[in-house]
Amino acid sequence: MTKTAMIDVGGGFRAIFGCGVMDRMLEDGIDVDMCYGVSAGAANMTSFIARQHGRNHTFYTKYAFRKEYASAESFFKNHNFANLDYIYGTLSNHDGENPLDFAAFEANETGFTVVACNAEDGATKYFDKSRVRFDDFDIIKASSAVPVACEPYVVDGVPYFDGGIADPVPVQKALEDGYDRVILILSRLRDEVRKQQKDLAPARILERSHPAAAEKLRMRYKTYNDELELAKHYEAEGRVLILAPEDLYGLNTLKKNFEGLEMMYRKGYAAAEAIPAFLQA
């Protein structure tokens, strides 16, 4: 029996592309056996696994414009541009404004792996679904802690940074785990080559406190580019389906505009049309 995995690589506000993909999948009744989430992609997948259609869209297009969610004020006050405790605690807990349906999340047999980077030694950490607990989404926060923009997030006594600096496109991980086909959701153009330049300045800052993680950040461009090339190789073999936006609509990791968010969501929704044929081939 064919086993299918899905990967959402995250990408800050660009990651709303994946929300569109997953909402279309929920409408079409498409399930997968395993979800691999990186950074914001991990958060997207919690709603997908809980089958909460439209929940992610509300976070990106409504809550994200609140200063409590992500702002320079939050950075200067809490040393975190994105207030992870507000997003994945205040809003998401059972008594929050838009709680995750934890019972549905837990009951769904779909597996879930969350990628993070150990801030102390730079090692890749793959958290299991079982570490997502009632009103405890710490591994999502850890996977989303963008270096320098956020402090490392501590889980079980260990500090972690964003999974995107450790294993940004975990296609090889999914295949090694035994999945035959992989749906890969990107939030950059599929042929975009990452450049090292933009990571050098934050890596120099990070090096003062977390040198191993800084080296991971410094080399992220190569890790991402190499993993994406590998994904394209597997795509040519029919084992991977790459879904990616054709335009970023003015969005980046920490920059947003309402029109761009809506366009990215719609493009993700439309891109999901390719999934049934891929799974049936």
Regions found by a protein language model. Name each.
Residues 1-38, 46-281:
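Patatin-like phospholipase
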